[in-house]
Swiss-Prot record:
GO BP annotations, alphabetical order: lipid metabolic process
Keywords: Acyltransferase, Cell inner membrane, Cell membrane, Lipid biosynthesis, Lipid metabolism, Membrane, Transferase, Transmembrane, Transmembrane helix
InterPro entries noted in UniProt: AB_hydrolase_fold, PE-PPE_C
Ranges where the PE-PPE domain occurs: 104-325
Transmembrane segments: 43-63
Classification via Pfam families: PE-PPE
Taxonomic lineage: Bacteria, Bacillati, Actinomycetota, Actinomycetes, Mycobacteriales
Protein name: SL1278 acyltransferase Chp1
Length: 404
C-alpha cells in the first residue's frame, strides 16, 4: 500500500484512537467520539488505521521512496577463448556489483549498454568510446525515470559511464537534487588514463577522449584495488615487475573482485574522505591484497609450488612497492623499458630457493645456472636501430592530442 502523503492518510478519518495508534497525533476535542454501537464505523476506522500503519511501516518518518540501485557492468566477455581465459566476468553476478556499499533492500536494475571493447569483444563490436556514449544515454534516461534515492554502481568500463554522467549532470539545471543520487565506482580506468594522458586527449586505439575530472554535486564512493592497473596504476611505470603485477591484477586477479568487497572489513587507515567546493564527498576505499597478483599468477599458470608463494611474495613485494612511492614519476623512454628487462633475472634466485626446498637441490642448481645464463645474455642486450621501426609502429597507436 502506498499513501500519497501523511496528511492525505490522516485527513480521511479524524478520531483520537486512529491518530494515537497510526499517526501519533494529538486528539482534537472538536471531533466527537464514535458511538459504541456503530459497527460499520468501527470497521471503517479499523481498516483505515491498518492502512496507515502499513504506510508508517513502509515510509518510516515522513515521506520517502524506496531506494533503487542502477548498475552499470563492465566489459562484456570476449568471444575469443584465449582472451576470455584472461578476463571473464559472469553476467549473473552483475546485480551484486557494489551491493555492500548501498542499502541492501534497494531494488536493483542493470542498465543495458554494449559494454564492448573493440577488437577484444569482437571485430564487429563498438569501440569503448561508442559503448560509453550509449551507456551514458541509457543511464541518464534511467536516472530521470526513477524516483530517488538512487545508488548508481559501476564496474570497470561501467565507471567510465558514471564519470561521463556525473559530468553531464554537473552542468544540467534540471539534474536531480544532490541528496537523491550517490555514485559508486569500482575499478575506474580513468585513474589510469588521468595518470597517462592529459584531459582532452583522444586515445585512438579505444576511440575514447580522456575527460577532465568533474566537480560533481553528488556524493561518490571509489573502490580501489591495490595494484590494479586500472584504478591503482604504478607511479613509476619503468618498474617492469610492478607493470607485470599490475597487469595480473587488472586482467584476472583483483580488478573485478573489488566490486564485491565489504567496506566493513576495510581498515580505517585505508578509507579517505574529501569534500569538494559543492559540498559533495568522495570516499575512497583502498582494498589491500594479501598476496601479489603476480605471485598468484605464478602459482596458477607457471607451476610455482603454493608453499613457495610466501617466500616469493616477500622477495618481490619491496621491489614492486617502490613503483608506488609518492612523488613525481620520472619520464619513461621506451628504450629504457626494454633495457629494464635485464633486471628480471634478479628475481630468479629468490624463486630458486623455495623451489629447491620443495623439489630438491638439483632444481635449485638448475635454476641458478639458468639465471646466470640469462643474466649473461641480457647483459649484452641493447636497443639499437633495429628497434626503431617497431617503436614507430607503437607510436602510431598513441594519442595524437585533442580531438575536436
Amino acid at each position: 500500500m502506498k499513501c500519497p502523503g501523511v496528511s492525505d492518510c490522516v485527513a480521511t478519518v479524524r478520531h483520537d484512537n486512529v491518530f494515537a495508534i497510526a499517526a501519533g497525533l494529538r486528539w482534537s476535542a472538536a471531533v466527537p467520539p464514535l458511538h459504541k454501537g456503530d459497527a460499520v464505523t468501527k470497521l471503517l476506522v479499523g481498516a483505515i488505521a491498518g492502512g496507515m500503519l502499513a504506510c508508517a511501516a513502509i515510509l518510516g518518518d515522513g515521506i520517502a521512496s524506496a531506494d533503487t540501485a542502477l548498475i552499470v557492468p563492465g566489459t562484456a566477455p570476449s568471444p575469443y577463448g584465449p582472451l576470455r581465459s584472461l578476463y571473464h566476468f559472469n553476467p549473473a553476478m552483475q546485480p551484486q556489483i557494489g551491493a555492500n556499499y548501498y542499502n541492501p533492500t534497494a531494488t536493483r536494475h542493470v542498465v543495458s549498454y554494449p559494454g564492448s571493447f573493440w577488437p577484444v569483444t569482437g571485430l564487429n563490436s563498438p569501440t569503448v568510446g561508442s559503448s560509453v556514449s550509449a551507456g551514458t544515454n541509457n543511464l541518464d534516461a534511467a536516472i530521470r525515470s526513477t524516483d530517488g534515492p538512487i545508488f548508481v554502481a559501476g564496474l570497470s568500463q561501467g565507471t567510465l559511464v558514471l564519470d561521463r554522467e556525473q559530468a553531464r549532470l554537473a552542468n544540467d539545471p534540471t539534474a536531480p537534487p544532490p541528496g537523491q543520487l550517490t555514485f559508486i565506482k569500482a575499478g575506474d580506468p580513468n585513474n589510469l588514463l588521468w595518470r597517462a594522458f592529459r584531459p582532452g586527449t583522444h586515445v585512438p586505439i579505444i576511440d575514447y577522449t580522456v575527460p577532465a575530472p568533474a566537480e560533481s554535486q553528488y556524493d561518490t564512493i571509489n573502490i580501489v584495488g591495490q595494484y590494479d592497473i586500472f584504478s591503482d596504476p604504478p607511479n613509476r611505470p619503468g618498474n617492469l615487475l610492478a607493470d607485470l603485477n599490475a597487469i595480473a591484477a587488472g586482467g584476472y586477479y583483483g580488478h573485478s573482485a573489488t566490486a564485491f568487497s565489504d567496506p566493513a572489513r576495510v581498515a580505517p587507515r585505508d578509507i579517505t574522505t574529501t569534500t569538494n567546493s559543492l559540498g559533495a564527498t568522495t570516499t575512497t576505499y583502498f582494498i589491500r591484497t594479501d598476496q601479489l597478483p603476480l605471485v598468484r599468477a605464478l602459482v596458477d599458470m607457471a607451476g610455482l609450488p603454493p608453499q613457495a608463494a610466501g617466500t616469493v611474495d616477500a622477495a618481490l613485494r619491496p621491489i614492486i612497492d617502490r613503483a608506488y612511492q609518492p612523488g613525481p614519476a620520472p619520464a619513461v623512454n621506451p628504450r629504457d623499458l626494454v633495457q629494464g628487462i635485464r633486471g628480471i633475472p634478479a628475481i630468479a634466485p629468490a624463486i630458486a630457493i623455495p623451489i629447491g626446498s620443495t623439489t630438491g637441490a638439483s632444481a635449485a642448481t638448475s635454476t641458478a645456472a639458468a639465471t646466470a645464463a640469462a643474466t649473461n645474455a641480457l647483459r649484452g642486450a641493447n636497443v639499437g636501430p633495429g628497434a626503431n621501426k617497431a617503436l614507430s609502429m607503437v607510436r602510431g597507436l598513441l594519442p595524437k592530442g585533442k580531438k575536436h
